[in-house]
Regions:
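Residue-level detector of alpha-helix initiation sites
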Residues: 13-14, 78, 125
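N-terminal Rossmann-like NAD(P) cofactor-binding module of classical short-chain dehydrogenase/reductase
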Residues: 71-72
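Short glycine-/small-residue-rich Rossmann-like dinucleotide-binding loops
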Residues: 75-76, 99, 207
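Rossmann-fold NAD(P)-binding glycine/threonine-rich loop
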Residues: 83-85, 89-90, 98-120, 129-137
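Rossmann-like NAD(P)H-binding beta-loop-alpha module
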Residues: 130-146, 164
């Protein structure tokens, strides 16, 4: 079987290095490009050695100079916007794992997906996407409770994370609201806010240390509570999911796909 050729955008970052390390030992993949910011101090370094693995003879570059079968982006919104346009112009499938995109950037993603295959998900984790499926099921059952259900989402990430709440937390809320019908999304509480209305979802973001990601979704009823918690113990879960998504995207036609499509959920 011929390996799928991939490029990693954001290759010198924390996630990019794990993508390089894990992608380099996957017999179904071949890393042919590793791209980072043109101002990165790691330009020219071997991507494999930078990631702490074997030499790959693939230098960190400031631009995409080859034609891979798929690109994986783990960067920041403005850089993701640039690689999106490059993939669009070259007709290259894209796995978009960057979070924190604004509405205009999201609109560009939807438009580009009419021309190229894009796997776009706030989390590449298998268990996170399974938890989303469980939350949709729970919401469909619990919304019938006469006493009402209070939904709160608590997410924890490392101190370096720039967007809050996480894109994954917002996706959990979007899924639950789509099933249960909540209209208000409240971010934290402070002061005399009054009694809690049942038509809202509360979000609470915690930033500590090097936590790679944790989400707890609370369904509170009278007399009982259901909590669904998913925890990442390291970043490999996101990298492995993104690598699987690249294999998937390389075989698809134009369209906007999610990790649910990759996992068959």
């Amino acid at each position: 079987m011929t390996p799928t050729t991939i490029a990693i955008h954001g290759a010198a970052g924390r996630m990019g290095r794990r993508l390089v390390a894990l992608g380099s030992i996957d017999p179904e993949l071949k890393i042919v490009a590793a791209v980072d910011s043109p101002s990165s101090p790691d330009l020219g370094k071997d991507a494999g050695l930078l990631a702490g693995t074997v030499e790959l003879h693939v230098p960190i570059a400031g631009a995409l100079n080859v034609q891979p079968q798929a690109v994986i982006d783990f960067s920041v919104p403005h850089a993701a916007e640039q690689i999106l346009q490059i993939c669009l112009s070259r007709q290259v499938p894209l796995v978009l794992a960057t979070t924190g995109c604004n509405d205009a950037q999201k609109a560009q993603i939807h438009l580009a997906a009419q021309t190229i295959p894009i796997v776009w998900s706030p989390s590449m984790s298998t268990t996170v996407n399974l938890a989303m499926k469980l939350c949709a099921t729970a919401g469909a059952v619990l919304k019938q409770m006469a006493s009402g259900v209070d939904v709160e989402i608590i997410e924890r990430h490392h101190r370096m994370k720039e967007d809050s709440p996480s894109g994954t937390a917002l996706k959990f809320g979007e899924i639950i609201a789509g099933v249960m019908g909540q209209q208000v999304h409240r971010h934290g509480r402070e002061g005399q806010v009054g009694r809690r209305p049942q038509h809202e979802i509360g979000y609470h973001a915690v930033r500590t240390g090097d936590n790679p990601g944790e989400h707890t979704i609370v369904f509170g009823l009278l007399g009982e509570t259901l909590e669904i918690t998913v925890k990442a113990t390291n970043r490999d879960c996101y990298a492995l999911g993104a690598l699987a998504a690249a294999k998937f995207a390389a075989c698809q036609g134009p369209g906007l796909y999610s990790m649910s499509d990759v996992l068959g959920l």
